[in-house]
Amino acid sequence: VYAVTTGPLPRIVAVVVTFNRLPLLEKLVARLGEIEGLAEVLVVDNASSDGTGEWLADRPTTGEIPLSGRTLSTNRGGAGGFHDGLAWAIDREADLVWLMDDDGLPDVDCLDRLLLETDNLDFWGPLVVDEADPDRLVFPIRLPGGTRVVHAVGDVRRAASHDRIDGIVIPFNGVLVTKELVDRIGLPREEFFIWGDDHEYRLRAEEAGARVATVVTATVRHPSVGNLGTPMMFGRTTYNDSPSDLKHYCMARNNLVNLRDYRGPLHALAFVVKTAWFYTFTRPSLSRLRLSVGAMRAGIAGDFDGHRRFLS
């Protein structure tokens, strides 16, 4: 626990994971150079082919803050990037690690506002708002203790107590994690590649008794990701259907593993039934049904290599 007003300030290291989005990375790195309180910025480049590695090699600082880049030999997805980046930050003697993707842009006061809520938290982050419509959340929040899902920034701020909502965090979009928590629960599951690694890390943290929260006065701006769910079962629920075979394969595999490990066999079975219903009735597709079955079998068997066939 770090008191911001008394005692030594924590050593805060920002970790950015990037893949082939150099214009967005340039903007984000410039913004991080304007934020006081950062000791260092580390960028993990997932073997980008757009000149990211060369760009990083030419930049030892952003503003007054030391900047280091590390280009991985192969693209290991967000999961591999955050696994390596978090380990790197801890190796660089970080007390707090600020984790983010390359497509978010924290407000200049975002870190300050997060640090006002340092006491008694292990894993906490900002609201992630639509850059084109800052009154809307990019990732809707299900409020604790009920089924209500909120999409509007005003609604989530009204639901907050003392500027925060305990029990909710949206990793890895500008979240802070303490060294103590990393020492306790380890690193993100790199084998997930993409999809669900952030959710799994939050579930693992909660299972270990971590105190998580969203600070509603802190903001990261992020491009809209569109509608995250397609209505199904006569509008009773939604299904996360991606046009990308890679994303769908990882979602089906990793989500089943997360449900089995953290929610139990009934929740896992419900997801299997939901997937079968969606690709049989809602959006019929035999090929997508087969892909889902293969992904789920792989997850149950602990085989996390199947997604590689979708990588060019």
What are these regions (language model features)?
Residues R260-S312:
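Non-catalytic, C-terminal membrane-associated alpha-helical segments of glycosyltransferases
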Residues D45-E54, T74, G104-L105:
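A conserved acidic beta->alpha catalytic loop
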Residues D109-P140:
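Conserved donor NDP-sugar-binding/catalytic core segment of glycosyltransferases
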Residues A94-D103:
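Short beta-strand-to-loop acidic/aromatic patch adjacent to the donor-nucleotide binding site
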Residues R157-V177:
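A recurrent flexible, glycine/aromatic-enriched loop bordering the glycosyltransferase active site
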Residues T71-R92:
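Glycine-rich, basic loop-to-helix element that forms the pyrophosphate-binding segment
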Residues A30-A39:
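Short, acidic, metal-binding catalytic loop of nucleotide-sugar glycosyltransferases
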Residues V175, L181-G186, E191-A218:
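A short, conserved alpha-helix in the catalytic core of glycosyltransferases
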